[in-house]
From Swiss-Prot:
<dbReference type="Pfam" id="PF15240">
    <property type="entry name" value="Pro-rich"/>
</dbReference>
<keyword id="KW-0732">Signal</keyword>
<dbReference type="GO" id="GO:0005576">
    <property type="term" value="C:extracellular region"/>
</dbReference>
<feature type="compositionally biased region" description="Pro residues">
    <location>
        <begin position="51"/>
        <end position="237"/>
    </location>
</feature>
<keyword id="KW-0964">Secreted</keyword>
<keyword id="KW-0677">Repeat</keyword>
<feature type="region of interest" description="Disordered">
    <location>
        <begin position="15"/>
        <end position="261"/>
    </location>
</feature>
<feature type="compositionally biased region" description="Low complexity">
    <location>
        <begin position="238"/>
        <end position="261"/>
    </location>
</feature>
<dbReference type="InterPro" id="IPR026086">
    <property type="entry name" value="Pro-rich"/>
</dbReference>
<protein>
    <recommendedName>
        <fullName>Proline-rich protein HaeIII subfamily 1</fullName>
    </recommendedName>
</protein>
<feature type="signal peptide">
    <location>
        <begin position="1"/>
        <end position="15"/>
    </location>
</feature>
<feature type="compositionally biased region" description="Pro residues">
    <location>
        <begin position="32"/>
        <end position="44"/>
    </location>
</feature>
Length: 261
């Protein structure tokens, strides 16, 4: 824009000086007189004067004033230019220290870093938290859930004991009666046969006090386990593989005393 205005002003000045110079030449030609002897005309200064002005001649236009230094300016400045370059909008106030901020702070920033929500109470010591505490912070660090009662004194216990522990060790079953005085395998139902052992067991009543195939309802007898009780004293004559009576192996031998039924 400045270049265009400068060229337009130069063209206007050149077009205005053209007819003025022609009028001055036409006026100076008939009124020109030879200079007196010994007098020399002055040379033109800076190219603005073509010669000495004619004495007594008319001048159509006096100079309006000295031309501006450096070229014509279309518009004078309205005020001093801003330092540092043109600015489209003047600042409405002092700029914030540290850089532009879109929103001014509503209060003092919390210690420890920016938070999206302002705290509803005093900030907790130890760092930013997303949600403010509804009461005083717990001593020792944040806890998700407050304890409902006093903590256990020694450690976590899944189930409290329902009674006093056993004094010596685990006992599967308490004694329901007095133990027997000694191991008694089986009493004899009668005198043993004189001919050898027999395969069938006695059909009489069970012996009082001896072990039976069913488990005892009281503590084990003092003396140790016994694998198999003896059915009676061995025969006096030694074991015999075959009975003395030939052909009578399926039944009892003749003359065998039977016990009480």
């Amino acid at each position: 824009m400045l270049v265009v205005l400068f060229t337009v002003a130069l063209l206007a000045l050149s077009s205005a000086q053209g007819p003025r110079e022609e009028n001055q030449n036409q006026i100076q030609i008939p009124n020109q007189r030879p200079p007196p002897s010994g007098f020399q005309p002055r040379p033109p200064v800076n190219g603005s004067q073509q010669g000495p002005p004619p004495p007594g001649g008319p001048q159509p236009r006096p100079p309006q004033g000295p031309p501006p230094p450096g070229g014509p300016q279309p518009r004078p400045p309205q005020g001093p230019p801003p330092p540092g370059g043109p600015q489209p909008r003047p600042p409405q106030g002092p700029p914030p220290p540290g850089g532009p901020q879109q929103r001014p702070p509503q209060g003092p920033p919390p210690p420890g870093g920016p938070q999206q929500r302002p705290p509803q109470g005093p900030p907790p010591p130890g760092g930013p938290q997303p949600r403010p505490p509804q009461g005083p912070p717990p001593p020792g660090g944040p806890q998700l859930r407050p304890p409902q009662g006093p903590p256990p004194p020694a450690g976590p216990q899944p189930r409290p004991p329902q009674g006093p522990p056993p004094p010596a060790g685990p006992q599967p079953r308490p004694p329901q009666g007095p133990p027997p005085t000694g191991p008694q395998p089986r009493p004899t139902q009668g005198p043993p046969p004189t001919g050898g052992p027999q395969q069938r067991p006695p059909q009489g009543p069970p012996p009082p006090g001896g072990p039976q195939p069913r488990p005892p309802q009281g503590p084990p007898p003092p003396g140790g386990p016994q694998p198999s009780p003896t059915q009676g004293p061995p025969p006096t004559g030694g074991p015999q593989q075959t009975p003395p009576l030939a052909g009578n192996t399926q039944g009892p031998p003749q003359g065998r005393p039977q016990g009480p039924r």
